[in-house]
Amino acid sequence: MKAVQRIFQTGRFSVAAGPSVRFQAGFLAANRQVRFSSNHGVSLEEINTKYNDFFSNVQDQFELQRGLNNCFAYDIVPSSDVIEQALRAARRVNDFPTAVRIFEGIKVKLPTKEQYQAYVKELKPVCNELGIVLKEDLFK
């Protein structure tokens, strides 16, 4: 036991360690895997069509949040048409917080503030129609 403690204190794993320590270190290294996306051939148009259809048919809060999670999991930012359908779905299921958080997701996905402001400007009429206030406007 003292040998194991000494090894952990020095930060080195060596042959002096017991078999359980070597097994644990090997087990941890073996579980490190790089996982890649399997959607290599999916185009932007296919994603937009898929999520436009999905959000236009959402009927409950769980489906809406699941769809948003899946939509934002891609390496691309959804188009403004998809965001508009998601906002309409959020108001349809009476989920105001999710409607506000959709814009937070867009802000995180976009690399610059100018791009975010372009999304906000394009979706401003929809926000006014649905009564959605952005987080920036709530905390002024």
From Swiss-Prot:
Superkingdom of the source species: Eukaryota
Pathway where it operates: Energy metabolism; oxidative phosphorylation
Alphabetical keyword list: Heme, Iron, Membrane, Metal-binding, Mitochondrion, Mitochondrion inner membrane, Transit peptide
GO MF terms held by the record: metal ion binding
Subcellular location: Mitochondrion inner membrane
Membrane topology: Peripheral membrane protein
Assembly behavior: Component of the cytochrome c oxidase (complex IV, CIV), a multisubunit enzyme composed of a catalytic core of 3 subunits and several supernumerary subunits. The complex exists as a monomer or a dimer and forms supercomplexes (SCs) in the inner mitochondrial membrane with ubiquinol-cytochrome c oxidoreductase (cytochrome b-c1 complex, complex III, CIII).
Similarity section: Belongs to the cytochrome c oxidase subunit 5A family.
The protein's name in its UniProt record: Cytochrome c oxidase subunit 6, mitochondrial
